[in-house]
UniProtKB/Swiss-Prot annotation:
GO terms for cellular component: membrane. The gene is gnt15. It is a single-pass type II membrane protein. Residues 1-24 are cytoplasmic. Keywords: Glycoprotein, Membrane, Signal-anchor, Transmembrane, Transmembrane helix. Disruption phenotype: Slow growth, aberrant morphology and development. Produces a severe defect in spore formation. Cells are more adhesive. Alterations in glycosylation on membrane proteins and decreased gp130 and gp150 levels are observed. This is Glycosyltransferase-like protein gnt15. Residues 202-246 have a biased composition (Low complexity). Residues 46-516 are extracellular.
């Protein structure tokens, strides 16, 4: 052993080992000093900040800035659904990672209509796993088109995935959902029926306009002769009617405030609304058909998924306050840009117990087994939906957009812009897109008999080593400095003026938690 040691060219190394064995505390000190140096100055060091409870610094890491415009390799229709999807006119748009594949199967099992899904692929193993899982779900094989987006060293590219799924949807009408949401059975049929009546409404309105134009041309001379005689009488009537309408609206709104709508006392609320109607008060909630084309005909007589009649079927909606339509529909845009709001909830109960009709849903809510989505985390994110009003509604109603509203929407994809692909990771991806829709003139109409429920799960980190806060405030910086002002400029608004109570560029209140 001694000869081997003395003759070995690496004997200096052995001697070093001998010395280390004799004085291990010296080596330990060296390792500690190296670790401290790397922790403070190296890649493991956490970027310190002097932020307060509300403010947060924007990450200056090169990985964040370099990834803003990263390109991704994609493969569209990596799997194409086997079913005949030509007969459908609405698709769900969603995105997910391979470990959430079971959720897309659950979604497809309830939706039973086209789904365009983008899958985030991080390895070849993911591809094998996808095709193995596809074979295990009949609903997926029949209804789901899968498009692959391959990872490229960035945070989770949520908007790249959404755009990939959206561009390759087989229908013009699309419902954007996260993969953890489940719809009730029959919701596709309800939405399809709503769109059918919307098309019929528009066609009838066009025909009526053509007929009216012809009649107007024939009657112009007669009308001109009669106008002078009727002017004085009309002026008197208009003044009287306007005064009556204003008085009725004020009285009804005051009585609504007196009702103090309680979402946990649905039966009492319904009785109070019925009492108002029996007293002959004028209600200011119009049905969707009148909102869109001025027709007096009803659109949705509370279309139920299972033909179960709720207590409030075919009743005018007394609402719970909120946004009222003017009698002349002056609130409504004339560009036919409509987005339908699907109220969203969350629950930890088994998905097999999720309700498929509104009456059962309300029972679960009263038992606190199903809750409004994000009500404790971000009340402003879904506040304009006005859940208290929705519980009682049997007809669609218009809501007023306000930043930071982020409902799940059914829209015509030909009318919207892409989701901003600079936003990667967690935060403000849907909020900012909805802001752009509002700036472009969209109306947001809540449907009374459609909803989705989030299947609660243990939170997992988003792609990337950065924290939730870092990802969220990095995204918020892009939203404040670029996305919001750009959306206003594109639609003819002053980028430096508030439009929907949104934060302004270079404002101290932008990078704070005050938004939500």
């Amino acid at each position: 052993m001694s000869n081997f040691y003395n003759n070995n060219p690496r004997r200096n190394t052995f001697r070093l080992t001998e010395r280390i064995k004799k004085k291990p505390y010296q080596t330990l000190i060296v390792f500690i000093l190296i670790f401290l140096f790397l922790y403070v100055f190296g890649p493991f060091g956490e970027k310190k900040s002097n932020n307060n409870n509300n403010n947060h610094p924007v990450s200056k890491t090169s990985s964040f800035t370099e990834s803003l415009y990263t390109k991704f390799q994609t493969e569209t229709f990596a799997y194409r659904a086997n079913g005949d999807l030509k007969k459908y006119d609405i698709s769900i748009i969603t995105q997910f990672t391979v470990d959430r594949f079971d959720r897309i199967a659950m979604m497809a099992d309830k939706w039973r209509a086209p789904i365009s899904a983008a899958v985030y692929i991080t390895s070849f193993k993911d591809i094998d796993e996808v095709f193995k899982l596809v074979r295990n779900s009949f609903a997926v094989t029949e209804f789901v088109d899968l498009h692959f987006l391959f990872a490229n060293k960035t945070r989770y590219p949520v908007n790249n995935l959404r755009n990939l799924a959206l561009r390759n949807a087989r229908t013009e009408w699309c419902l954007l959902l996260d993969v953890d949401f489940i719809s009730p059975l029959g919701m596709y049929d309800y939405l399809h029926s709503t769109l059918e009546k919307l098309d019929t409404s528009n066609n009838n309105n066009n025909n009526n306009n053509n007929n009216n134009n012809n009649n107007n041309n024939n009657n112009n001379n007669n009308n001109n002769n009669n106008n002078n005689n009727n002017n004085n009488e009309n002026n008197d009537n208009d003044n009287g009617n306007n005064n009556n309408n204003n008085d009725n609206e004020k009285n009804f709104k005051k009585k609504q405030e007196d009702l103090k709508i309680d979402p946990n006392d649905f039966e009492g609320d319904l009785k109070a609304i019925e009492k108002l109607k029996r007293n002959g008060e004028k209600l200011y909630v119009k049905n969707l058909k009148k909102v869109l084309d001025g027709s007096e005909n009803n659109l949705g007589k509370n279309i139920n998924f299972n033909n179960n009649n709720n207590d409030n079927n075919n009743k005018d909606d007394g609402g719970g306050g909120g946004y009222y339509l003017n009698s002349d529909n002056s609130n409504i845009n004339n560009n036919n840009k409509i987005a339908f709001v699907i109220p969203s909830f969350s629950s930890s109960i088994s998905r097999f117990d999720f309700p498929d009709n509104k009456k059962d849903l309300l029972d679960f809510i009263k038992q606190d087994l199903i809750k409004e989505i994000n009500s404790g985390v971000c009340p402003k994110c879904h506040g304009p939906t006005n859940y208290s009003r929705w519980y009682l509604s049997s007809e669609p109603y218009l809501v007023q957009y306000k930043w930071i509203y982020e409902p799940f929407l059914l829209y015509n994809r030909s009318q919207i812009h892409d989701y901003d692909e600079r936003l990667k990771g967690y935060g403000f991806d849907k909020n900012s897109h909805t802001f752009g829709m509002a700036a472009a003139g969209f109306d947001f109409v809540v449907l009374p008999d459609a909803w989705i429920i989030h299947m609660n799960h243990v939170s997992k980190p988003w792609e990337g080593a950065d924290t939730f806060n870092e990802q969220m405030f990095d995204c918020l910086s892009i939203v404040c400095e670029s996305i919001l002002p750009d959306a206003k400029s594109k639609n003819g608004y002053d980028p430096n003026a508030k439009l929907f109570n949104e934060p302004l560029k270079n404002n101290d209140n932008c990078l704070t938690r005050e938004h939500w």
